[in-house]
Amino acid sequence: MADNRWQGMEDLSYVRLLEEQLCAHRENVNYALATIVDTDQNTARTQGKMMVYENGAAVGTVGGGALETKVIHDACQAISTGRGGLFHYNMNSQAAREGLACGGSMSVFIEVYASRPVLVMCGAGHVGGCMMRLARLTGFQIILADERPEALIADKINAADRYIPIKNYEEDLGKARLPQGAFYVLAGPNHDADRKALAAVLNASPAYVGMIGGKPKITAIFEKLHAMGYSQEQLDQVYTPIGLDVGNETPEEIAVSILAEVLMVKNKKGRPQNV
């Protein structure tokens, strides 16, 4: 009877762990999963799983105490480097020092689950729609931001993982709590929309920000942002002309050239045309 009660508690803890993992995947959050894979006869716990976030918060357990603290530390390091693996822990010496009955050794496998890179598509036009489709194929989470009536862009909204309706770019993108290191592509319905989006994005610590437009448009937008107090260093972050020069003309070709540039920045390889 007692064994059944303990089994029920174990089942509930694993259900909670699975729910937490699903939530992390939905919210696109980095985490690691630590699983006991081997122990000796002196270890108090012979099985267990623990989910660890990059800030050290944990769900589940691999035994508690100093050993669990060490596992959490190693899991956080694994998230930071992107490399998990098999970790071995020997608690016999510490148990002897502290006069504990339980020591033993344990092997824990730590798996890293990295969040997907985030593409924020500001503009749901023809190029934006093509970009969203292509970026999804290369593993991006897609966030769409647009100021047009939702009925006009319903198909683009449905294709995105998340949609941010825009009335004021600075306020709405700020309230959206977008992750640092996101990739922004600005292809709004007009110059004013792109200027407002760029003004909001430059303070968001982007990994990449590119804007569609010819030289007159870019010059006019940069002059206005200079007048608003944005520095040349901030404006130098902007990839424009956007994308690789492949002689692109159609929305599909333009999207391919932009995504190629985004991937070069993400993977730290290649050379964009504005260098």
Which residues does each predicted region cover?
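Segments forming oxygen-rich coordination pockets for charged ligands
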Residues: M1-P165, G174-F183, K217, E223-K224, ...
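Glycine- and other small-residue-rich loops at beta-strand/loop junctions that grip anionic moieties
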Residues: G64, L186-N190, G210, G243, ...
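Short phosphate-binding/catalytic loops that engage adenosine nucleotides
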Residues: F140, P206, Y230
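ADP-ribose/adenylate-binding Rossmann-like module
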Residues: A145, F183-Y184, G188-P189, A199-K224
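Glycine/threonine-rich flexible loop motifs
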Residues: R195-A197
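Adenosine-phosphate binding glycine-rich loop
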Residues: I212-V275
